Amino acid sequence: MRYLLLRWLAALVCVGVFSLAQTSAAPKPDQPDKPNLSGTWMLDLKASTSVEPLMKQIGAGLLERTYATSTKLKATFHQTEQVLTIATRGPSFALDETLYLDGRTDPSNQQLLGATALKTRTAWSEDHKQLVATHQIKTKQGKGGQLIITRYLINEGKSMVVAFTLKLNAEPSNTFARQIWNMQT
């Protein structure tokens, strides 16, 4: 009798474990998959709008603005559930970013388009299709504001849009720019 009871208990445990594993692995219908931005991307200057007006408002010099609007850049993205690392390279240019995808605010001292990012908060949009990084910045003229960088995939994941929105405190309007990056195979 004891042997039969142990077999029955073992069978019950197995059923419970396998049922739990299948339930845990099943995708949750109310949480769509987040796009995977990992890969190597090349900036398409012709398809992009110029970042020059945005950089000018930030206070970037003429040489910086000219370089940014005419240089082909390559970016390598590595994404995990918690972190996105971006290594952007070009002739005489390197920018490494680490974005924490859990919505926390991260202190920073990063130079972005001529401004200094003081802190950054990165989170997925409500529909989990866009990654939004909000940088609290200080311009070269000492003005405060936000540089919002939104990244999302288009063209069946073969291209990425990087949209910039500059909101400076006490400025009546925002400045926008959009870059198109194509996946390298």
Regions found by a protein language model. Name each.
Residues T23-T185:
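Hydrophobic small-molecule pocket/channel-lining residues, especially in calycin-type beta-barrels
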Residues Y3-L4, G16, A75:
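Short non-domain terminal segments
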